[in-house]
C-alpha cells in the first residue's frame, strides 16, 4: 500500500514538473512574440542575436514545445527526419538572408571591414545601444558564421547555390517525397509548354523572314544609293578642317591633319614672299605720320613715352597661320592595339598585390596614355601610389606618373609613356576652334593635354609666368612658341615686347620686329637697367591712370577710344608690355639684388598696368627662383628636371622629374590645385624666321630711347656729405663695407649710412649688394683721395 502511494506521488510530481516547465516556456514564447515590456524586448534582442530577422521562428518553436510538454508530459524530440528537414530549411533561410546583408555592408562606407562576423556583431551592438533604429541583422550570428564559411569556400555564387540545395534537402526530409514526386508534374508541364512555344516562334520567324527578304534587299539598294550621293556631295563641298575637328579624340589620332591643306602650303608661302617688298615700301609713309601725330597729342594728359603710346598702323597685316608647317602624322596604330592589353595588365597587377580596381577610361595622348583607374570601396589611394615601380615593370614602361586622385573625378590617373611620340605643332594648336574663338591677343598656345585638347595660357590673367627645366627639355621652343603666338595675334600697337637673352643666341632672331621696345638685351649688366626702366614705365602708367581717373589699362584704353570717337585729335592707346627673360640664373649671378627687386616690384604691381613677365631658367635652384619670385609668380611651367627637389622648387610638388623631355611639361596656372600634363607645341627655327621676315616686312622697328639701357657713366660730382671722405677711408681700411658698420662707427641713422654706401657703389668704390654678405671693396688705399672727387 505504501509503495502504491509513493508511485502515485512520484507520478504526480513528474506531471506537475512538466506542466510547470511547459507554462514557463509558454510565458517566454508569448512575451517574446508580443514583445511585452522590457523582458519581451530583451528576449527579442537575444533571439535576433542568434537568428537575426528570423527571430520569430524561435518564439514559435518555443510555443510549440511548451504545448507539447504540457499535453504529452514528456520532453519534445530535438532530432528526427522531419525536424532535421526543418533545421536545413531554417539554415538555408538564415544563409540566404545574410547574402543580402553582406551586399548592403559592402555598399556602406561605414563598414569597410571585410569580416562578416565582426560587422554583424557591430550591427547588433549598435541596435542594442539605440544608435540604429532596428538595423537588419540578416540571419544573425548563426547566419554570419554559416555565410563566412560558405563565402570562403564557394564565394557568392556558390553560396546561393548552397542555399538552394539546403532548402531542397530540407523539403525532401520534411515531406518524405523525392524531387520527382514533388516537382515532376510541374517540370513536365513546363517542358511541354516551352517546346510548343519554341515551335510556334520558329514557324513565325520563318514566315517573317520569308516575307521580309525582298523588303530587305530593297532597303539595301536604297541605302547604297544614299551613301553614294553623300560621298559625291562630300567630295565637292566637304570642309577638311571642320571634318577633322568633329572627329572624336578618343578614336582618331589627334595629330592627324587634313592632307589636302599640305598641298597648298608651298603655294601660300610663294604668294606671301613677293608681298613683303611691297609692304616694306608702303610702310615708310605711315611711320612718319605716326611721329607727327604723337607730337600733337598729350596736352590734356600727362606726358607719355613712345613705349606707352603708339599710333596704330592701319596697313599692318597679321601673319597668316599658313606660314607654319603642317604636322607629319605619326602612326599610333600600335598604341591603340595595346590599350586594352595594358588596361588588363594594370588590373591584374593591382589584383596580384591585393588591390581591387578596374580601368574605366583610357586617354591616348600625343606622348602619354592616361589610364583612369577606379579603386573599389575600402582601397586606399596610397596603396596604388606606392605601386608605381611595380606597375612600370608590368607595363615595361620607362617611367610612369600617378595622379591621385584626378581633380573632379573619383579615379586615379596612371600616365604611361607611348612607344611612338606624336609631335604636336604650333599650327594645329592655333588652328583649333578654341583658338579661333579666343580674341585675347595675349592668349598663347602651349600644346595639347593628355586627352588631346589644345591648352592655352592667357598672359593677362596669369599675370606672370615662370618657365624652368633642364637643358634640352623644350624650354626654348616653348618661349619661341609663346612669342610666335603673340606675333600671329597682336599688332605692334597692341603688344610690345622686351627681350633679355644673356646667352645671346636664343632671341636674337627677333631683332628688328616692330613689337620690340628695344633691341634684344644680351648683356647681364644692361638687363638690370632694362628691368629698372620697365619699373619706371609702370610707375608712369599708374601716374597716367591716376590723372585720367581709371584703374587699369583696359579702362584707360576704353576711355581713350571713347574720346577719339568724339574728338578730331586721335590719342594712341597703351599697348601691353611682355618682358621675356630667357636665362634668369645668369642675371641673378651678376646682379641678384637689383634684378630680384625689379622682378618683385613688377610681379606685385604690373598687372593693372598691362605689363607681364615670362621668366625662364634651366637651373631651378632656390638661389635663382627665390621665395620672393615664387610668391609673386603663381603660374609656372616645369619641363623635365633631374630631381624631385628641383620639381618642388618650381611647382611645390613632385612629378617634373618623371617627364619625358622633348616638350613634355607640367603646366600649373594661377588658381589650379594640381598641374596639368601638356605635350608642348613644336616650332622649328625655319618657321620662326619665316614669321619674323613677314613681320619685319610689314613694319620696321621703332625702338623707344627711354626704354633702351645705356652704358652707366661714372659719377664725377662731389658728394654733399662731410662724412663721405671719412666713410671711404674707413671702408678701405677695414676692407669691408656695410650700412650697419657706418651706423656704429659714425653714430648716424640708417638712411644716411645707406646713402653713403650707394654713393660709394655709384663711384665704383664698393661692389653691389650680395644679400647677407658684406660688400666687396673695389679700390685700394692709394685711390682714396681720388674717390672723393
Curated annotation (Swiss-Prot):
Region (Disordered): 226-302
Residue stretches making up the FtsK domain: 452-648
PROSITE patterns associated with the record: FTSK
Organism (species): Halalkalibacterium halodurans (strain ATCC BAA-125 / DSM 18197 / FERM 7344 / JCM 9153 / C-125)
Complex and partners: Homohexamer. Forms a ring that surrounds DNA.
Membrane-traversing stretches: 20-40, 49-69, 83-103, 152-172
Bias-annotated ranges (Basic and acidic residues): 275-291
Primary site of residence: membrane
Cellular-component GO terms for this entry: plasma membrane
GO BP annotations listed: cell division; chromosome segregation
Cytoplasmic side: 173-789
Protein's gene: ftsK
Name of the molecule in the record: DNA translocase FtsK
A Pfam family assignment: FtsK_alpha
Amino acid at each position: 500500500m505504501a509503495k502504491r502511494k509513493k508511485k502515485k506521488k512520484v507520478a504526480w510530481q513528474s506531471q506537475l514538473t512538466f506542466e510547470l516547465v511547459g507554462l514557463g516556456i509558454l510565458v517566454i514564447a508569448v512575451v517574446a512574440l508580443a514583445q511585452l515590456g522590457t523582458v519581451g524586448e530583451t528576449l527579442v534582442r537575444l533571439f535576433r542575436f542568434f537568428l537575426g530577422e528570423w527571430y520569430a521562428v524561435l518564439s514559435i518553436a518555443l510555443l510549440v514545445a511548451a504545448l507539447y510538454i504540457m499535453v504529452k508530459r514528456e520532453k519534445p524530440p530535438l532530432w528526427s527526419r522531419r525536424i532535421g528537414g526543418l533545421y536545413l530549411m531554417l539554415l538555408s533561410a538564415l544563409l540566404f538572408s545574410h547574402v543580402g546583408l553582406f551586399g548592403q555592408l559592402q555598399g556602406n562606407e561605414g563598414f569597410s571591414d571585410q569580416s562578416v562576423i565582426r560587422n554583424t556583431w557591430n550591427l547588433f551592438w549598435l541596435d542594442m545601444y539605440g544608435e540604429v533604429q532596428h538595423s537588419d541583422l540578416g540571419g544573425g550570428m548563426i547566419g554570419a558564421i554559416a555565410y563566412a564559411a560558405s563565402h570562403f569556400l564557394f564565394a557568392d555564387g556558390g553560396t546561393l547555390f548552397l542555399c538552394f540545395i539546403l532548402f531542397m534537402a530540407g523539403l525532401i526530409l520534411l515531406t518524405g517525397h523525392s524531387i520527382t514526386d514533388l516537382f515532376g508534374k510541374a517540370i513536365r508541364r513546363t517542358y511541354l509548354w516551352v517546346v510548343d512555344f519554341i515551335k510556334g516562334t520558329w514557324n513565325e520567324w520563318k514566315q517573317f523572314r520569308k516575307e521580309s527578304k525582298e523588303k530587305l534587299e530593297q532597303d539595301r539598294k536604297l541605302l547604297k544609293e544614299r551613301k553614294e550621293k553623300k560621298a559625291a556631295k562630300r567630295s565637292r563641298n566637304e570642309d577638311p578642317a571642320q571634318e577633322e575637328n568633329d572627329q572624336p579624340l578618343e578614336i582618331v589620332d589627334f595629330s592627324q591633319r587634313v592632307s589636302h591643306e599640305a598641298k597648298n602650303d608651298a603655294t601660300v608661302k610663294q604668294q606671301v614672299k613677293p608681298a613683303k617688298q611691297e609692304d616694306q615700301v608702303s610702310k615708310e609713309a605711315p611711320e612718319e605720320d605716326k611721329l607727327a601725330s604723337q607730337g600733337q597729342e598729350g596736352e590734356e594728359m600727362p606726358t607719355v613715352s613712345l613705349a606707352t603710346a603708339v599710333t596704330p598702323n592701319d596697313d599692318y597685316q597679321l601673319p597668316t597661320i599658313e606660314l607654319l608647317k603642317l604636322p607629319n602624322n605619326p602612326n599610333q596604330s600600335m598604341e591603340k592595339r595595346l590599350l586594352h592589353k595594358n588596361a588588363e595588365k594594370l588590373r591584374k597587377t593591382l589584383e596580384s598585390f591585393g588591390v581591387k580596381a578596374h580601368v574605366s577610361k583610357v586617354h591616348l595622348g600625343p606622348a602619354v596614355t592616361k589610364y583612369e583607374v577606379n579603386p573599389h570601396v575600402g582601397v586606399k589611394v596610397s596603396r596604388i601610389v606606392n605601386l608605381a615601380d611595380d606597375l612600370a615593370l608590368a607595363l615595361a614602361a620607362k617611367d610612369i606618373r600617378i595622379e591621385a586622385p584626378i581633380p573632379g573625378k573619383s579615379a586615379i590617373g596612371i600616365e604611361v609613356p607611348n612607344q611612338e611620340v606624336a609631335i604636336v605643332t604650333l599650327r594645329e594648336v592655333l588652328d583649333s576652334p578654341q583658338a579661333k574663338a579666343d580674341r585675347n591677343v595675349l592668349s598663347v598656345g602651349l600644346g595639347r593635354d593628355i586627352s588631346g585638347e589644345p591648352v592655352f595660357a592667357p598672359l593677362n590673367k596669369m599675370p606672370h609666368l615662370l618657365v624652368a627645366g633642364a637643358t634640352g627639355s623644350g624650354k626654348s621652343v616653348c618661349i619661341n612658341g609663346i612669342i610666335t603666338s603673340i606675333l600671329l595675334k597682336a599688332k605692334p600697337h597692341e603688344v610690345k615686347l622686351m627681350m633679355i637673352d644673356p646667352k645671346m643666341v636664343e632671341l636674337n632672331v627677333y631683332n628688328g620686329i616692330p613689337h620690340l621696345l628695344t633691341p634684344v638685351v644680351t648683356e647681364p649688366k644692361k638687363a638690370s637697367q632694362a628691368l629698372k626702366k620697365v619699373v619706371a614705365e609702370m610707375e608712369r602708367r599708374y601716374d597716367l591712370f591716376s590723372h585720367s581717373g581709371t584703374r587699369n589699362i583696359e579702362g584707360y584704353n576704353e576711355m581713350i577710344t571713347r574720346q577719339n570717337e568724339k574728338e578730331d585729335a586721335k590719342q594712341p592707346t597703351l599697348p601691353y608690355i611682355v618682358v621675356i627673360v630667357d636665362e634668369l640664373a645668369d642675371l641673378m649671378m651678376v646682379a641678384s639684388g637689383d634684378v630680384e627687386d625689379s622682378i618683385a616690384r613688377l610681379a606685385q604691381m604690373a598687372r593693372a598696368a598691362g605689363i607681364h613677365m615670362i621668366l625662364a631658367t634651366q637651373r631651378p635652384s632656390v638661389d635663382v627662383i627665390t621665395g620672393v619670385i615664387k610668391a609673386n609668380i603663381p603660374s609656372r611651367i616645369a619641363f623635365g628636371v633631374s630631381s624631385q627637389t628641383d620639381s618642388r622648387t618650381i611647382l611645390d610638388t613632385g612629378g617634373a622629374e618623371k617627364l619625358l623631355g622633348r616638350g613634355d611639361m607640367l603646366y600649373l596656372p594661377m588658381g589650379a590645385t594640381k598641374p596639368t600634363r601638356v605635350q608642348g607645341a613644336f616650332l622649328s627655327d625655319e618657321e620662326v624666321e619665316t614669321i619674323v621676315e613677314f613681320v619685319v616686312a610689314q613694319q620696321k622697328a621703332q625702338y623707344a630711347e627711354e626704354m633702351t639701357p645705356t652704358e652707366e657713366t661714372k659719377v664725377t660730382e662731389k658728394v654733399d656729405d662731410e662724412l663721405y671722405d671719412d666713410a671711404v677711408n674707413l671702408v678701405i681700411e677695414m676692407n669691408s663695407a656695410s650700412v650697419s658698420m657706418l651706423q656704429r662707427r659714425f653714430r648716424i641713422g640708417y638712411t644716411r649710412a645707406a646713402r653713403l654706401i650707394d654713393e660709394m657703389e655709384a663711384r665704383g668704390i664698393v661692389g653691389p649688394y650680395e644679400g647677407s654678405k658684406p660688400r666687396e671693396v673695389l679700390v685700394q688705399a692709394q685711390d682714396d683721395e681720388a674717390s672723393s672727387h
